[in-house]
Regions:
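Hydrophobic core segments of alpha-helical transmembrane domains in multi-pass membrane transport
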Residues: 12-15, 31-32, 36, 63-70, ...
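Short, hydrophobic transmembrane alpha-helix segments
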Residues: 13-25
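Structural signature of hydrophobic alpha-helical transmembrane segments
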Residues: 22-34, 57, 81-92
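Membrane-spanning helices that line or support transport/gating and their immediate boundary helices
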Residues: 28, 40-48, 52, 79, ...
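C-terminal ends of transmembrane helices
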Residues: 38-51, 98-108
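Cytoplasmic-side transmembrane-helix entry/capping segments in multi-pass membrane proteins
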Residues: 49-62, 83-89, 113-116
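Transmembrane alpha-helix boundary signature
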Residues: 68-83
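C-terminal transmembrane helix-loop-helix hairpin of multi-pass membrane proteins
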Residues: 113-168
Length: 168
């Protein structure tokens, strides 16, 4: 079950960030990394986390990996960091990541938890990239910034706006 298309999880970044293939792929890969790493950490620490504080602990673990991703993106590409803006930080509260930590990683060994994160993260990344590519092609007539239809192309401006995510 694809987390975006079937479970409708993580819709905030899907609608807001997927206006270009580049932004969508970057956000998808960032989410994939955070999901795999947080699943691994939650699974490894599951026996030591008291039940009463497990959700807060999961959020702290997720926030740690989001901070790493945020700093890496900022160091590698300041333009990309500006384009993604606050949505990188919002990975912390993505219900997909917290849901997988609670439903799977907290009950399974590290290896399976990483595979679960990889599968769900790749599904999320694929969905985000697909929507981003379609929106960029229809809205700007380009793919990864490369013009596909020439200078005379009149794109559908709504497709590159956040509301355009509802049309794809």
């Amino acid at each position: 079950d694809n987390p975006v298309f079937v479970q409708t999880l993580g819709m905030c970044p899907v609608l807001a960030v997927s206006n270009t293939a580049r932004n969508a792929l970057a956000m998808g890969l960032a989410t994939l990394f955070v999901l795999c790493m947080s699943n691994a950490a939650v699974s490894a620490l599951r026996r030591f986390i008291p039940r009463e504080v497990r959700i807060a602990t999961y959020i702290l673990i997720i926030a740690t990996f989001v901070t790493v991703v945020d700093y890496v993106i900022q160091a590698v590409s300041l333009d990309l960091h500006r384009a993604l803006g606050a949505f990188i930080s919002l990975i912390v509260v993505n219900c997909l990541i917290l849901g997988r930590a609670e439903a799977f990683a907290s009950r399974n060994p590290v290896g399976l938890s990483i595979l679960d994160g990889l599968g769900n993260g790749m599904g999320f990344c694929l969905a985000l990239f697909s929507l981003g590519a379609v929106r960029e092609i229809l809205g700007a007539g380009s793919f990864f910034g490369i013009s596909l239809f020439g200078a005379s192309f009149q794109g559908w401006v709504v497709m590159i706006l956040p509301s355009g995510g509802f049309f794809t």
